[in-house]
């Protein structure tokens, strides 16, 4: 029972983060599940099963509020679904003990990318004439992001969100809505790949329902939270958290000398704290709390 409550909290925390940033539900929840000793394939399968429900709810909400660029969604869902299915089949064939440290390394690198992006490259997009993706851009982007999402348990948001933010004409809210809406197809495709490769018997449905419950509870809270807190600060906090969780797995797997473990954790914590303080100095204490009006004014 205690583990189910913990998994529900993991789902809640992950959805709060994803609903605020448009990324990191899969990365956060998979990282925490791996920390509990769950094999990479089962962890990723559980997360994607839960995401079928959470991404559907998120997508409907974004469509309702006009936060979706439908053309971009159509361009990404087919190549993304193919990549997710192939990634799920690939991960399912790897032995859990062999794959775990490498998946943690991949997630740690994604966490580092999220942290660096929000630390140094955060620039709210301005509304300009929309320049859509062409096939040479959308197909490789969808396949790579879908494959990364299935193999790492997360990656659709961290890969697609910064690419779309760099495009002209898509405001941050539309980027988040487009990524979240298209992720439903990715979750369905990855789930199909896992169920075909792993079978139903390896899935713990109580874990899945716990993750779903936490995510459903967090969805409206996240919608409120994204209007209140500065996204740059949230991004740095999330990136550092992902690094710390996955660093624990890598340290335990690859560094036998336990005497140096506290030193490594201290160094990671110090760097993370420095990054948070740096962001606070950039945005100013008065700008930590953002209102919906402030955000929408920047987008227009």
Curated annotation (Swiss-Prot):
<dbReference type="GO" id="GO:0005886">
    <property type="term" value="C:plasma membrane"/>
</dbReference>
<feature type="transmembrane region" description="Helical">
    <location>
        <begin position="260"/>
        <end position="280"/>
    </location>
</feature>
<feature type="transmembrane region" description="Helical">
    <location>
        <begin position="231"/>
        <end position="251"/>
    </location>
</feature>
<keyword id="KW-0472">Membrane</keyword>
<feature type="transmembrane region" description="Helical">
    <location>
        <begin position="206"/>
        <end position="226"/>
    </location>
</feature>
<keyword id="KW-1133">Transmembrane helix</keyword>
<protein>
    <recommendedName>
        <fullName>Probable membrane transporter protein YtnM</fullName>
    </recommendedName>
</protein>
<dbReference type="InterPro" id="IPR051598">
    <property type="entry name" value="TSUP/Inactive_protease-like"/>
</dbReference>
<keyword id="KW-0812">Transmembrane</keyword>
<feature type="transmembrane region" description="Helical">
    <location>
        <begin position="102"/>
        <end position="122"/>
    </location>
</feature>
<dbReference type="InterPro" id="IPR002781">
    <property type="entry name" value="TM_pro_TauE-like"/>
</dbReference>
<feature type="transmembrane region" description="Helical">
    <location>
        <begin position="33"/>
        <end position="53"/>
    </location>
</feature>
<dbReference type="Pfam" id="PF01925">
    <property type="entry name" value="TauE"/>
</dbReference>
<feature type="transmembrane region" description="Helical">
    <location>
        <begin position="76"/>
        <end position="96"/>
    </location>
</feature>
<feature type="transmembrane region" description="Helical">
    <location>
        <begin position="4"/>
        <end position="24"/>
    </location>
</feature>
<keyword id="KW-1003">Cell membrane</keyword>
<comment type="similarity">
    <text>Belongs to the 4-toluene sulfonate uptake permease (TSUP) (TC 2.A.102) family.</text>
</comment>
<keyword id="KW-0813">Transport</keyword>
<feature type="transmembrane region" description="Helical">
    <location>
        <begin position="139"/>
        <end position="159"/>
    </location>
</feature>
């Amino acid at each position: 029972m205690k583990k189910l409550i913990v998994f529900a909290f993991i789902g809640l925390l992950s959805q709060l983060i994803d609903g605020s940033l448009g990324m990191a539900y899969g990365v956060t929840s998979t990282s925490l599940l791996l920390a509990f000793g769950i094999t990479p394939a089962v962890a990723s399968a559980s997360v994607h099963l839960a995401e079928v429900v959470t991404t559907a709810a998120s997508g409907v909400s974004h469509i309702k509020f006009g936060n979706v660029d439908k053309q971009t969604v159509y361009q990404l869902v087919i190549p993304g679904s193919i990549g997710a299915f192939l990634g799920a089949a690939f991960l399912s064939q790897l032995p859990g003990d062999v794959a775990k440290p490498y998946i943690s390394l991949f997630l740690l690198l994604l966490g580092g990318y999220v942290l660096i992006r929000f630390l140094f490259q955060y620039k709210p997009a301005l509304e300009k004439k929309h320049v859509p993706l062409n096939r040479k851009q959308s197909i490789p982007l969808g396949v790579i992001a879908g494959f990364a999402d299935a193999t790492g348990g997360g990656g659709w948001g961290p890969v697609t969100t910064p690419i779309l933010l760099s495009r002209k004409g898509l405001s941050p809210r539309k980027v988040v809505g487009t990524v979240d809406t298209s992720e439903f197809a990715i979750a369905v495709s990855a789930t199909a790949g896992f169920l075909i490769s792993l079978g139903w018997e390896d899935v713990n449905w109580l874990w899945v329902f716990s993750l779903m419950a936490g995510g459903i509870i967090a969805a409206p809270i996240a919608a409120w939270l994204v209007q209140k807190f500065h996204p740059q600060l949230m991004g740095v906090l999330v990136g550092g958290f992902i690094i710390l969780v996955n660093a624990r797995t890598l340290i335990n797997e690859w560094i036998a000398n336990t005497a140096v473990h506290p030193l490594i954790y201290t160094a990671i914590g110090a760097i993370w704290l420095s990054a948070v303080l740096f962001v606070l100095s950039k945005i100013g204490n008065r700008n930590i709390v953002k209102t919906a009006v402030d955000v929408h004014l920047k987008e227009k």
